[in-house]
Structures are given as structure tokens and as C-alpha cells.
Amino acid sequence: MARSKTSQRWLKEHFDDPYVKMAQRDGYRSRASYKLLEIQEKDRILRPGMTVVDLGAAPGGWSQVTSRVIGDRGRLIASDILEMDSIPDVTFIQGDFTEDAVFARILEAIGEHPVDLVISDMAPNMSGVRAADQPRAMYLCELALDLAGRVLRPGGDFLIKIFQGEGFDQYHKQAREMFDKVQMRKPLSSRDRSREQYLLARGFRGE
């Protein structure tokens, strides 16, 4: 089957992408690692010994970065609907985050340990129809914020991929009510044509 012009363009962009080449060189599973590395360099959200939850973790780029920083004394619970090759000392839960049973398994894995940081690079399978994609993306964001509200310790932080569009302003407002400080980040490694941004909320206010 002949490749479409769109897929040919994607393949060329992918293999010409300096971040793809860097990931191969540095041993990271995806170019997404550099988004978290950039945010870490600017904001220092990861520290040794932390307990972290990584949502939308596959193929494991963010989990690799996180695991390297938090070290042996840290604790990382990762989840994705897709399979993920194991990473030492990472607890992985495979399943659809929108299903109550999977949500419950994540909560069970966390247990009574207060969480220092929740990170999420989740996105739905995009159809290209913005009117359909945006609500699905925002629904995942809302579920992630709900989880963060349940498990974060007072003073904990939250980082999530989010797309500008319907529901964004209300979500931003909700995050400001739950955290002391909310900022937006657009890493250089995020493709220019992408609408994705990262919302960084710091200082969870707790109950």
C-alpha cells in the first residue's frame, strides 16, 4: 500500500527530528523525555526520594527521566492503556484510565503513601476533528486532576499536558483554586504546530 503524503511527511519529520536522534543517543524511549527534562531544568519539580505518579506513561520516556532523578529511595507508579516495557523499581499498571477499575488499581498501588508529584502526558487518540478531540482530551485532564486531588500531599505538585480550546479556561480556574501557583509551559521540544502545552500547578492546598 502506497504511503499517503501525510504519512510520508510525518516519517520525514520524525527521522529528521533532532530530539528523536537525541533520544536514540541518550537511551530514552521517546522524544517526550526532553519535554520533561526541559521543565525539570527550569522548575526542579523532581527530587531524589520523591513519590511520583506518571499517567499516560507508555512507552516510558517520562518514567525513565523520573526514575533517574528520584533514585532508589523514590517511588514511581506509572500507568497507561498501552503496554510498557518494564523499568527497574517502577510499578506499572496497564489499563484504561477512564475505567473505574483501573483508577482504583492506581489508588491501591499508591496506598497510604502521600504523593509528592503527579505528572501526565496523556492524550486521546486524535481523530483530527477538533470538536471531537478537545472534549476527550479535557476529560482525561479532568480525571488526572481528580486523582491529584485525592493523592497529593499538601504542598505537592501537578504537571499535565493540555490543549488550548474549549474547557481550558475553566480547567485553569479549577487548578488555581486547588494550588498556590499555576503556570503554563511550552517546551522547545514540543513541536511548533502542536497545540499542546503543559500546565504546572505547584503547592497543593489539600482539603
UniProtKB/Swiss-Prot annotation:
<dbReference type="InterPro" id="IPR029063">
    <property type="entry name" value="SAM-dependent_MTases_sf"/>
</dbReference>
<comment type="function">
    <text>Specifically methylates the uridine in position 2552 of 23S rRNA at the 2'-O position of the ribose in the fully assembled 50S ribosomal subunit.</text>
</comment>
<keyword id="KW-0808">Transferase</keyword>
<keyword id="KW-0949">S-adenosyl-L-methionine</keyword>
<dbReference type="InterPro" id="IPR050082">
    <property type="entry name" value="RNA_methyltr_RlmE"/>
</dbReference>
<feature type="binding site">
    <location>
        <position position="96"/>
    </location>
    <ligand>
        <name>S-adenosyl-L-methionine</name>
    </ligand>
</feature>
<dbReference type="GO" id="GO:0008650">
    <property type="term" value="F:rRNA (uridine-2'-O-)-methyltransferase activity"/>
</dbReference>
<dbReference type="InterPro" id="IPR002877">
    <property type="entry name" value="RNA_MeTrfase_FtsJ_dom"/>
</dbReference>
<protein>
    <recommendedName>
        <fullName>Ribosomal RNA large subunit methyltransferase E</fullName>
        <ecNumber>2.1.1.166</ecNumber>
    </recommendedName>
</protein>
<feature type="active site" description="Proton acceptor">
    <location>
        <position position="161"/>
    </location>
</feature>
<dbReference type="InterPro" id="IPR015507">
    <property type="entry name" value="rRNA-MeTfrase_E"/>
</dbReference>
<keyword id="KW-0963">Cytoplasm</keyword>
<feature type="binding site">
    <location>
        <position position="62"/>
    </location>
    <ligand>
        <name>S-adenosyl-L-methionine</name>
    </ligand>
</feature>
<feature type="binding site">
    <location>
        <position position="121"/>
    </location>
    <ligand>
        <name>S-adenosyl-L-methionine</name>
    </ligand>
</feature>
<feature type="binding site">
    <location>
        <position position="60"/>
    </location>
    <ligand>
        <name>S-adenosyl-L-methionine</name>
    </ligand>
</feature>
<dbReference type="GO" id="GO:0005737">
    <property type="term" value="C:cytoplasm"/>
</dbReference>
<feature type="binding site">
    <location>
        <position position="80"/>
    </location>
    <ligand>
        <name>S-adenosyl-L-methionine</name>
    </ligand>
</feature>
<keyword id="KW-0489">Methyltransferase</keyword>
<comment type="similarity">
    <text>Belongs to the class I-like SAM-binding methyltransferase superfamily. RNA methyltransferase RlmE family.</text>
</comment>
<dbReference type="Pfam" id="PF01728">
    <property type="entry name" value="FtsJ"/>
</dbReference>
<keyword id="KW-0698">rRNA processing</keyword>
